């Protein structure tokens, strides 16, 4: 693979990650595209409900590449809380696959990376930066 494709691949990873995050949020809040397991409810105001709201609001922002760095940092924190508060408490805190927390760990570190690396070239953040650079006065 050519190294010059790395920025575009960063954008692609960001877009796919956001697509998955939106689904996680809509399942929590709306039972779509898959219903919650039988007997599972997420009360308004609960930690899971707050997570769903962060995912439904933050997901589209990440997908479009708007306010990418701060939103990705917040979502990395959300996923860390999800892991340590939700999954690690079930036991096997050092083994995320054993407590079904590995998606939260993967999301956490990918969002942390995106918060440092930025959105990539296929984003509204990048488009706005290019526009500002082209209209900046030359000194």
Residue ranges and their predicted role:
Residues 33:
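Conserved catalytic-core motifs of eukaryotic protein kinase domains, centered on the activation segment
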């Amino acid at each position: 693979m050519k190294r010059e494709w790395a920025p575009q691949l960063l954008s692609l990873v960001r877009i796919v990650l956001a697509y998955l995050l939106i689904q996680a949020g809509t399942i929590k809040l709306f039972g779509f595209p898959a219903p919650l397991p039988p007997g599972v409810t997420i009360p308004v105001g609960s930690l899971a409900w707050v997570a769903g709201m962060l995912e439904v609001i933050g997901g589209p922002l990440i997908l479009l590449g708007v306010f990418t760095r701060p939103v990705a940092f917040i979502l990395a924190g959300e996923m860390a809380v999800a892991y340590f508060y939700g999954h690690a408490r079930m036991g096997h805190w050092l083994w995320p696959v054993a407590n079904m927390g590995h998606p939260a760990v993967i999301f956490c570190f990918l969002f942390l990376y995106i918060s440092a690396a930025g959105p990539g070239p296929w984003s509204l953040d990048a488009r706005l930066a290019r526009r500002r650079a082209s209209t900046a006065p030359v000194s």
